[in-house]
Amino acid sequence: MLNTHIRKLKVFIIAVLILSGCATIANLDLNKLYGDENSENRASANIEQASSPSSASQFFEDDVAPIIEQRCVVCHACYDAPCQLKMSSPEGIERGANKEKVYHGDRLLAATPNRLFMDALNPIAWRERGFYPVLNERQQNPVANTQASVLAKMLQLKQQHPLPKDKLLDDRFDVSIDRSQECPTIQEFSAYADSQPFAGMPYALPELTSDEHNTLMTWIEQGAYMPNRAPISAEQQQAVDNLEGFLNADSLNMQLSARYIYEHLFTTHLYFKELVEPHTQPQFYNLVRSRTPIGEPIDIIASRRPFDKPDVSRVYYRLQPVVSTIVTKTHQPYAIDKSLLDKWQSWFVDAEYNVISMPSYEPEVAANPLIAFAQLPVNARYRFMLERAQNTIMGYIKGPVCRGQVALNVINDHFWVYFVEPEVATSPELNAFYESQRDNLRLPAEQESTALAVNWVEYAKRQGDYVRARHKFMNSAVEGGQQLSIDDIWNGDGNNDNASLTIFRHFDNASVIKGLVGAPPKTAWVIDYPLLERVHYLLVAGFDVYGNYGHQLLTRLYMDFLRLEGEANFLAFLPPKSRSEVHKSWYQKAGPELTSFMQGKVNKFDQPSGIEFTTKNYKEELFDMFAEHLKSVQPNEYKIKDSKLSHNNKALLAELNKLQGFSASILPELSMIMVELENSDTPEIFTLVRNSAHYNVNSLFFEEDNRDFQNDNVTLVHGLLGSYPDVFWHVKEADIAKLVAKAQEIKT
C-alpha cells in the first residue's frame, strides 16, 4: 500500500514538473518572439494612442464595449468571476486574472483583499499581487497582440470548438457554483487547450457570432485600446460637491453622523434623482473613505471593513463615480433627493444631542454599532435604516456574504418582513435597555478576519442572556399595561412602501422586494432597531469575503440567532398558547441543541398581546390584519392583474400558483416566462419562483435531509425577479392554456 502511494506521488510530481517545464519553455519562446512581458509596454502604447487623433476610442465605445457587456460581463463582474477576471470595466480587463478563488470558505488564514478600484490602482501594482495579464504586455504589434493574449486565445478556442448542439450540456461542462477552476497564463495556454478544448469563452454558452468575434479580434490585434472616460458634468459635480460638503462638516455631531451614514451605504450605488434624464441610466457613485478633502483627487482608505481603523487624523467621505457596467446581482440603487436630505438634516443635524468625542476604531467598539454610535439618537439611526429598508436588507441579499448554499440555508425560501413602529422601538425605556445590553449584543466581526469557530459558544451565551433580559423587559412592560398591538407595526408613515418586504431564497442566492408578495408564507420576521442594526453589521459591514473559515462560520452561525429573534418578535403578536405550537411547526426535526435553546430562552415571553382574534387560524388571521394595516403602502409591482394579458389568460396563467408538492419541487429555482401578446408587439414578462420547503433551516450541512418536498410551492409574479434565471419559457398568449396544462402534468 505504501509503495502504491509513493508511486502515485512520484507520478504527480513528474506531471507537475513536466507542466512547469512546458510553461517555462513556452515563456522562453514568447520572450524570443515578442520580448519580455512588462505592463509598461501596454501603458506606453495606450498613452501614445490617447495623445494622437484616432478612431480607436469610437471603435471601442460603439463596437467593442457593447459586445463585452452583452456576452462577457454576465460571468465576469463579481467576486466569483472566473479567475477573478472582471470584464465590467477597462480597469478590470487591464488588471487581468488570478488563480486564487475569492470564495474559499475553508481557508485557515484570512486572504489578502484584491478589490478593484481599491487595493491597487494600476496593472503594475496588480502584477505584484499575483494577477497576470489577459492582454498582450510584450512588444506592441498586431501579431504579438493576438499571439500573446490569453483573451484572444480563449475566443479562438471557442470558435474552434463551439458549443455542442445538444439540448443539455454534458459532463464536459461544469457550471456548479463550487466548480474547480483552471486559469491558464499565456505560457500555459497550449496545454490548457489540449486538455480542455471546450473551455473557450464564453464558457458553456453559445460562441460569439462571426461579426462579434471578428470585432473583438480586430480590437485585440490593434492593441485593445480602452479610452479614458469623460469627466462628470458640471451639474453632477455641483451635486457631488454639495453632498460631500454636508457629509464633511466639521462638528463632531456631523463627523459621527457621516461615519454612520457611510458604514450603512458603502455597498450602495448613490445617484441624484433630480438629475436623471428620461430613459437614461443615472450616473452612480460609491461612497468611500478618503484621506483627501473635497476638491482634491480621492485617495481611498482601503480597509477590509468600513469601520476599520483609517490611520489618519481625519476621514473624508467622498463620492467616487461608478465606472463599471451595472449588473443586477450587485446593484443597490440609492436615490438622493431633496426630500431625503431634508430628513437627514432633521435626524442628524437639527436633533438635540451632543457628541462629546469620536468613538474608537478598535474592533470591540467599531464592530458593535450599539457602542460605536451610542451618542447618536436611536430615532435617527432607526429612521435612517427604515427610510430605505429594502436597501438595508439588500446589503445582505446582494452583498458578497449572500452566495452559496451554506450562506443561504440559514433563511427560509419565502418569508415576509415587518418592522416595529419607530416611536415604540426608540422610546426612552427601550433606549435605556439597549444601553444595558451593549455587551450581550457584540458581533463576530470584533474577532476580525482570522477567527476561531469555537468562539461561537461565547456568542451563544451572550445571545441567550440578551433574549432572557429582553423577555423580562417585555414582560414588565406588558404587566404595566403596554400590550402589543397592530399599531406597533410600522405602516411606513402612510407613504413609504418599504414598510413590508418579501424575501425569496433561490438555493444559493436570494432576492428582496417591497411589499407582501405571494401566498402567506410559513414564517415571518418582525424587526426592531437592534435586530436591523445587527443584521447589517453581521452580514454587510462586518463580513469579510476574504476572511478565514472561522470568521465565515461564526457569521453563518450567529445569523441563526438573528433569524430566531425576528421570528420570535412575530410570534409575540399571537396568543400565548399558540406561539410554541407555531414555532414547533417551523422547526420540525430540529436537533437537541436548538430545541434546548428555543425552549429555554426564546419562548419565555408568555404575556398576551392586545390583539383580539376571531378564528383559530391565528397566524393567517395575523397576516390578514398586518396586510390591512399596511394596505396603503403596498406597491403595485409584481401583480398579475396589472399585465396586459386578456382577463381569461391572466386567470389561466395564475393557475401556476397552485403547483405544489413534488410537482413544484421538480421546477427550477427561477423560470422567466416571456409571453408574446395577441394585441401588442411588446411582450409581457413573468417570473415563476420555486419555494423549497424545509422541516427546519437550522442545519449548517446536509440540507437535503431537511427538505420537506411535499410542501414545496411556487410564486408567480409579473415582471422580472431574481438575478440568476435558470430557464426561459417563450410562449404565445394563445398557447398559455397549453403551457399551464403541461406544467401541471410535470411528474419527473
Roles of regions detected by a PLM:
Residues 19-21:
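C-terminal motif of bacterial Sec signal peptides marking the signal peptidase cleavage site
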Residues 2-13:
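Bacterial N-terminal signal peptides that target proteins for export
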Residues 23-748:
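Aromatic- and Gly/Pro-enriched helix-to-coil junctions and flexible linker segments
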